């Protein structure tokens, strides 16, 4: 068995985000001035969270966000950011570069509706979920393999992450429960993973948790809101337990979804919206 913390962050704002234009994969827009401020704010919020692995989409808006977060981090020195195309935003094909309102018009003309409508040249929701599933399974296998190696090696302890209640304070303070670990105040995890990705992709990842892994939202969270697209640099945090049995599904504990309190001092748009 292996257990790890999973922190997922949406990239900071771009000019296209501000103007409600679809980017997808074909438009590789950098962060705006506000986007860099948001990324730094997320980095400060996560500055005392220890990460063992950092992954990011290979699109520039996500890469810049990941770099800003790690630049602010005080506990994760010399961690290489791994850029992976499986974390890219949903491809919107002919709708890329167009206003979100036009996508809705395209969907209506085709007899569909957002977000299930797939524009010409775009990815279906099933394809996006398949990417999320593939990467999550890879992540679970990676942590399991590293955990197994550490158990067999007395010299492997450096990779183990001792998570104290203070290490999770940024998240626990936003959860109604005093600790997600019950009575224990000192828990050892096998890894602490940071992912930086995109709004529609992240929503489909969480839907994969809900529909395929039977993840349930804590009672204080509204499902309809949490399945909307995260604000820019919205932060979600989970604890994942992976069993050794091939047929056993990972267990997901939710600490927070689409957290954005770190943006309160920079006048950023924190609205949730549907795509």
From Swiss-Prot:
| Classification via Pfam families | His_Phos_1
Tell me the organism.
Xenopus laevis
The role this protein plays is:
Fructose-bisphosphatase hydrolyzing fructose-2,6-bisphosphate as well as fructose-1,6-bisphosphate. Acts as a negative regulator of glycolysis by lowering intracellular levels of fructose-2,6-bisphosphate in a p53/TP53-dependent manner, resulting in the pentose phosphate pathway (PPP) activation and NADPH production. Contributes to the generation of reduced glutathione to cause a decrease in intracellular reactive oxygen species (ROS) content, correlating with its ability to protect cells from oxidative or metabolic stress-induced cell death. May play a role in mitophagy inhibition.
What SUPFAM superfamilies does this protein map onto? Answer: Phosphoglycerate mutase-like
Q: What is its EC number?
A: 3.1.3.46
The residues annotated as site (Transition state stabilizer) are 198
Q: Which residues form the active site?
A: 11, 89
Q: Which gene encodes it?
A: tigar
Q: What's the name of the protein?
A: Fructose-2,6-bisphosphatase TIGAR
Q: Which InterPro entries match?
A: His_Pase_superF_clade-1, His_PPase_superfam, PG/BPGM_mutase_AS, Phosphoglycerate_Mutase
- What protein family does this chain belong to? Belongs to the phosphoglycerate mutase family.
């Amino acid at each position: 068995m292996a257990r790890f913390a999973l922190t997922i962050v949406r990239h900071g704002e771009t000019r296209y985000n501000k103007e409600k234009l679809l980017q997808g994969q074909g438009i590789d827009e950098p962060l705006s001035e506000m986007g860099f401020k948001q990324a730094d704010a997320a980095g400060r919020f996560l500055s005392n969270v220890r990460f063992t692995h950092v992954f990011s989409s290979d699109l520039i808006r996500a890469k810049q966000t990941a770099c800003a977060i790690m630049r602010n981090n005080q506990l994760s020195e010399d961690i290489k950011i791994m850029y992976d195309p499986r974390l890219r935003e949903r491809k919107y094909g002919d709708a890329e570069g167009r206003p979100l309102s036009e996508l809705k018009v395209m969907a209506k003309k085709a007899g569909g509706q957002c977000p299930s409508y797939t524009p010409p040249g775009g990815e279906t929701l099933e394809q996006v979920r398949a990417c999320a599933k593939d990467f999550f399974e890879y992540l679970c296998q990676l942590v399991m393999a590293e955990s197994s190696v550490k158990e067999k090696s007395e010299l492997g302890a450096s990779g183990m992450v001792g998570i104290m209640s203070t290490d999770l304070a940024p998240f626990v303070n936003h959860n109604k429960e005093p600790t997600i670990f019950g009575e224990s105040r000192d828990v050892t995890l096998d890894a602490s993973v940071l992912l930086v990705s995109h709004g529609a992709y992240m929503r489909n990842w969480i839907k994969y948790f809900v529909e395929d892994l039977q993840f349930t939202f804590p009672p204080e969270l509204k499902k309809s809101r949490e399945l909307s697209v995260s604000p820019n640099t919205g932060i979600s945090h989970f604890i994942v337990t992976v069993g050794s049995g091939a047929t056993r599904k990972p267990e997901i504990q939710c600490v927070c979804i689409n957290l954005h309190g770190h943006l309160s001092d920079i006048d950023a748009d924190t609205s949730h919206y549907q795509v």
